[in-house]
Amino acid sequence: LTAMRNHQKTFTMLLVLVLIGLNMRPLLTSVGPLLPQLRQASGMSFSVAALLTALPVVTMGGLALAGSWLHQHVSERRSVAISLLLIAVGALMRELYPQSALLLSSALLGGVGIGIIQAVMPSVIKRRFQQRTPLVMGLWSAALMGGGGLGAAITPWLVQHSETWYQTLAWWALPAVVALFAWWWQSPREVASSHKTTTTPVRVVFTPRAWTLGVYFGLINGGYASLIAWLPAFYIEIGASAQYSGSLLALMTLGQAAGALLMPAMARHQDRRKLLMLALVLQLVGFCGFIWLPMQLPVLWAMVCGLGLGGAFPLCLLLALDHSVQPAIAGKLVAFMQGIGFIIAGLAPWFSGVLRSISGNYLMDWAFHALCVVGLMIITLRFAPVRFPQLWVKEA
C-alpha cells in the first residue's frame, strides 16, 4: 500500500512538472507568427523586435546565476508559485494594444518567471528522482519544447477566431494559472521548503570547464532562440502564410520534444559525446536545409533541426550534472552553465536581427548558426568523462 502511494505521488509530481514545463516557452514562441503584424502596429525595427525573444532569454541567464541565492532565501514552493504568477501577468499585459514598451515589459516580466523556475527545477529533479534523473530531465525538457510548439501552432488559429488579433497573446495566461494551482496543491507534499546544504563551498566560476559548458550551452540555445524569433518571419517573407509559418515552428518544437525524450533515454553511458555529436549533426542538416532548399522540404528541415536542438538541451544538463555526484555542486554547475548560456543565447536573436537588417534576408543568420554548430562539434570532443575536474567528483 505504501509503495502504491509513493508511485501515485511520483506520478502526480511528474504531471505537475509537465504542466509547469508547458508554460516555459509560449511567451516566446507565440510572438513569432504575429511578428510582422506586431512590428507594423508598434513600429519596431528588426533589432528591437528581436528583444521580444532576447530579453526573456537573457533574464533566464541572470536568474540562473542567482540560483544559489534563491535556494537559500526563498522556498521552492513560493519561488515557483510567484514565477507562474509573473508568467500569467506577463501574458495578460499583451491584451492591450501592442506598443514597444508594453511588449518588452511583458517579455521581461515573463522572462523573470521562466528564469526562476529553470534555476530551481534541475536540483528538484536531481533530488526527487535520483534514480531516474535522465528520463525525468528528458520529460521536463520535452514539456518545455512541447509548450513552445503549442504557442507557435495555436496562436495563429486563435487569431483567426478572435475579433482582436493581438488579444490572443493574452490567452497564454490561462495554462500558467492552471499550473500555479496544481503546484500549490502538490508542492506541500513534495517540496515545502528550500533545502539548504552545509557542504563545502565550491566556486565553479573560477574553473575553465564551467565557462566551457556555459559557452557550449549558450551557442546551442542561441540557435533555438533565433529560430523561434525569426523562422516564421523568414517563411512569411519568402511567400508562406502566417498559419503555415507558425505550423513549421510548431513542427520544429515537436521534433524538439521527440529529441528531448529519446536522446536522454538512449544515454545509458556517462560519455555523452556520441549522442551530443548526433544532435549537432541533425542541427547542421537543418540549418543547411534552410539555406539551400528552404521551400523544397521545409517540414523536414524544421523537424530535423528541432530533433537535434531538443536532444542537445537535456544532454547538456546531464553533462553538467555528470560532473559531480553531489547534488549541491551539480546544481551550482548547472545554474552557472544555464546563466552564462542563456545570456549568450539571448544575444543570438538580436544578432540575427542585425544580420537581417544588414543583408536584407535571413540566409546569413542560418549560415552563422551552421558555423556555430561546427565549432560545437570540436568542443564536444573535449567532454570525455576522464577529463572531468576531479575536485567536483570527490568533494561534497
Spell out what each predicted region is.
Residues 327-363, 369:
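A late C-terminal transmembrane helix in Major Facilitator Superfamily
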Residues 78-92, 274-289:
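Structural signature of the two symmetry-related core transmembrane helices
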Residues 106-142:
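Cytoplasmic helix-loop-helix junction between adjacent transmembrane helices
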Residues 31-32, 208-250, 255-260:
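Extracytoplasmic gate region of multi-pass secondary transporters
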Residues 43, 75, 96-101, 130, ...:
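Helix-breaking motifs and short loop linkers at transmembrane-helix boundaries and internal kinks
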Residues 62-101:
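Conserved MFS/SLC helix-loop-helix module at the cytosolic interface between two early adjacent transmembrane helices
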Residues 130-188:
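Helix-loop-helix hairpin linking two adjacent transmembrane segments in secondary transporters
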Residues 116-129, 311-325:
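Intracellular juxtamembrane helix-capping segments at the cytosolic ends
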